[in-house]
């Protein structure tokens, strides 16, 4: 019994230290309706609330470099900064000449020359990793995991090319398909999904997952896990050899 008490005590102390080591930051949209809470601890996670209701559960993000360094795991925070942006940007290919760029931003600076920037718009939450180093580096993996609080209904476009269960064969595709609607737990785990896709969070709230500003980086695909209410990011690896294609 004495040993049990000691073990329980040690467990409680360890849990307490883990909780105390975590740091949380909250970022709100300009109108206050959207809120994301970012947690820095053993992992870097964020969630999203809309009008006080959770629409995205705590979801991890990270980036792994070729040298083995992982941005987002057991990261040491060096500082934070925030700003509010309200400006007009030109939009020559849209129905309006200008668009309002209006958001609140939180930057988390970490000790190994990298940052994570979160932005909260009135209609969305965005994030990106930023390197402060002037040296080039290679990214070998990235963790993108969307974990939802319930088994929501999603409308997704599956990749048509390639073999079932063989993601590598599905990366080369035309990005064309009709959308399939089903619950997260019933999505086809053998097929990749491309963006954009939409998850219905209920009460008139739709979550559209997409990306922007890509340069020298593979686009994001998503995959489902059977029986689970989450979507996991998949990235096409850099090809060992390229061959000129054609349609002859």
Model-derived regions: residue spans:
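N-terminal accessory beta-strand-rich subdomains and adjacent acidic, glycine-rich linkers
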Residues: 24-248
């Amino acid at each position: 019994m004495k040993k049990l008490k000691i073990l329980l005590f040690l467990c409680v102390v360890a849990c307490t230290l883990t909780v105390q080591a975590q740091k949380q930051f909250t970022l709100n949209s300009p109108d206050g309706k959207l809120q994301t809470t970012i947690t820095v601890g053993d992992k870097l996670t964020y969630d999203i609330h809309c009008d006080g209701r959770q629409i995205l559960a705590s979801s991890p993000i990270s980036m792994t470099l070729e040298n083995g360094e992982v941005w987002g795991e057991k990261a040491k925070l060096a500082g934070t900064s925030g700003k509010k942006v309200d400006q007009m940007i030109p939009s020559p290919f849209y129905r309006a000449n200008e668009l309002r760029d209006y958001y609140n931003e939180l930057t988390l600076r970490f000790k190994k020359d990298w940052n994570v920037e979160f932005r909260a718009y009135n209609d969305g939450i965005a994030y990106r990793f930023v390197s402060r180093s002037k040296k080039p580096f290679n990214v070998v993996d990235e963790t993108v995991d969307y974990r939802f609080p319930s088994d929501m209904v999603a409308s997704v476009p599956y990749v048509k090319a390639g073999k079932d269960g063989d993601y590598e064969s599905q990366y080369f595709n035309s990005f064309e398909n009709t959308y399939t609607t089903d619950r997260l737990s019933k999505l086809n785990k053998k097929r990749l999904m491309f963006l954009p896709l939409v998850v219905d969070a209920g009460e008139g709230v739709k979550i559209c997952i997409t990306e922007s500003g890509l340069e020298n980086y593979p686009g994001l695909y998503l995959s489902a896990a059977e029986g689970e209410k989450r979507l996991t990011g998949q990235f096409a690896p850099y090809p060992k050899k390229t061959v000129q294609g054609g349609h002859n």
